[in-house]
């Protein structure tokens, strides 16, 4: 008899109660509670994934399901710990929730993780102590698995270098598995996050195709304090309607606009995926900007964070390994505008713009030529001009 599909939603635990609302307008104060709630929700989903019976995965899961669930879990937990949630009680609560998620799957985890932990033993980080305590606090005895691993107090760079071959092997293994092995892979990788964060960081990045997702608040912090470059790939129409991110004066030069190409109707009918093609063309233009290099930290922002992922993946594939995506984009439910971080009017703002190329005809009302322009209060007339400029020209 064919295996009966198991509904993921049927295995979900009741969602935790929402954290109490705060009247503070400071995103730094709200972030830990919001992130912890997101982490708890993600953990519930991961628990559902891990508690599927071995007979079910062939019908219930795909490679995309596994990669998506794992990266979502790690991203939300990382937010809880990194965005203002460094207090000991915050970390302990998140790790205990993770322990509860792993608990039902331990029989599956052990057989899948023994060899992985032997390879990862030299790179077990100090975080394993917190993970161990959290598992024990949740009533899980991790001793049989942890006995394989040995603590290593090494510098972070050495840990990451040592983790690379393990992560590479893990990615190859996960992508080559058959459907019947997906749950085992999911469980092993999830436990690897608890015990060996450097390995999981590299694995999740490879599965995702780009560095990771940042909340709007995280993106603002990275741009203003660490020099990250924020690249807005929205169309001029979308920017005029929704506005631009409001940045401090010392960070305004970190915002660059590279609108997606608007392929002509005839050309759209000739390509397999016009939306993807437009995003990949924008990524190639970004890769040639003088402002950024392959070692630069870049955050891609679109309207709802869907197209931005394609842009980030394309940049990663050509050597830009530090590409992030702003979760929710500018206009999404958890995007910049909804995060109340400040919005500037497009007509009154100053942002460096790379306009569409001459190879692809511009739509009506848009300039031709690949140019860098300064958009300001006096720029509306210049945007309406029909002058053709050579590539790289500046007006």
From Swiss-Prot:
* Pfam families, per database record: Rhodanese
User: What modifications does the entry list under PTM / processing?
Assistant: Phosphorylated in both bundle sheath and mesophyll cells, under both low and high light regimes (70 vs 900 umol photons/m-2/s).
Identify the InterPro entries for this entry.
Answer: CAS_plant (IPR044690), Rhodanese-like_dom (IPR001763), Rhodanese-like_dom_sf (IPR036873)
This protein's membrane topology, according to the annotation, is: Single-pass membrane protein
Sequence segments annotated as region (Disordered): 1-27
Q: Where in or outside the cell?
A: Plastid, Chloroplast thylakoid membrane
Its keywords, alphabetically, are: Chloroplast, Membrane, Phosphoprotein, Plastid, Receptor, Thylakoid, Transit peptide, Transmembrane, Transmembrane helix
Segments traversing the membrane: 183-203
Query: For bias kind Low complexity, which ranges apply?
Result: 1-12
The record's section on CDD domains has: RHOD
The residues covered by the Rhodanese domain are: 224-345
GO BP, sorted A to Z: cellular response to calcium ion; de-etiolation; regulation of stomatal closure
Residues where Phosphothreonine is found: 377
What's the protein here called? Answer: Calcium sensing receptor, chloroplastic
Q: State the organism named in the record.
A: Zea mays (Maize)
């Amino acid at each position: 008899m064919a295996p009966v599909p198991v509904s993921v939603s049927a295995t979900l635990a009741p969602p935790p109660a929402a954290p109490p609302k705060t009247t503070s307008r400071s995103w730094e104060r709200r972030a830990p509670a919001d992130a912890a709630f997101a982490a708890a929700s993600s953990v519930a989903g991961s628990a559902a994934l891990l508690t599927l019976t071995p007979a079910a995965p062939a019908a219930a899961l795909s490679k995309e399901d596994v990669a998506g669930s794992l990266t979502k879990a790690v991203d939300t937990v990382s937010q809880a710990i990194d965005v203002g949630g460094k207090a000991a009680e915050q970390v302990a609560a998140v790790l205990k929730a993770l322990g509860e998620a792993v608990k039902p799957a331990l029989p599956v985890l052990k057989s899948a993780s023994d060899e992985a932990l032997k390879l990862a033993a030299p790179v077990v980080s100090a975080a394993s102590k917190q993970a161990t305590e959290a598992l024990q606090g949740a009533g899980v005895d991790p001793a049989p698995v942890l006995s394989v691993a040995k603590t290593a107090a090494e510098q972070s760079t050495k840990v990451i270098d040592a983790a690379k071959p393990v992560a590479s092997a893990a990615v190859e293994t996960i992508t080559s598995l058959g459907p019947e092995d997906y749950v085992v892979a999911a469980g092993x990788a999830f436990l690897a996050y608890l015990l060996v964060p450097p390995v999981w960081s590299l694995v999740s990045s490879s599965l995702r195709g780009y560095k990771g997702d940042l909340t709007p608040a995280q993106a603002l912090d990275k741009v203003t304090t660490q020099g990250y470059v924020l690249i807005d790939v929205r169309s001029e129409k979308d920017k005029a309607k929704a506005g631009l991110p409001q940045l401090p004066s010392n960070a305004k030069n970190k915002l660059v606009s590279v609108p997606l190409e608007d392929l002509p109707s005839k050309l759209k009918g000739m390509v397999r995926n016009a939306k993807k093609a437009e995003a990949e063309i924008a990524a190639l233009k970004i890769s040639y900007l003088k402002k950024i290099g392959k070692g630069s930290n870049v955050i891609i922002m679109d309207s709802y964070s869907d197209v931005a992922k394609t842009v980030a993946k394309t940049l990663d594939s050509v050597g830009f390994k530090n590409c992030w995506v702003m979760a929710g984009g500018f206009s999404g439910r958890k995007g910049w505008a909804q995060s109340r971080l400040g919005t500037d009017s497009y007509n009154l703002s100053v942002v460096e713009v790379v306009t569409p190329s001459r190879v692809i005809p511009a739509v009506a009302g848009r300039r031709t030529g690949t140019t860098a322009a300064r958009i300001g209060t006096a720029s509306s007339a210049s945007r309406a001009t029909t002058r053709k400029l050579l590539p790289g020209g500046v007006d």
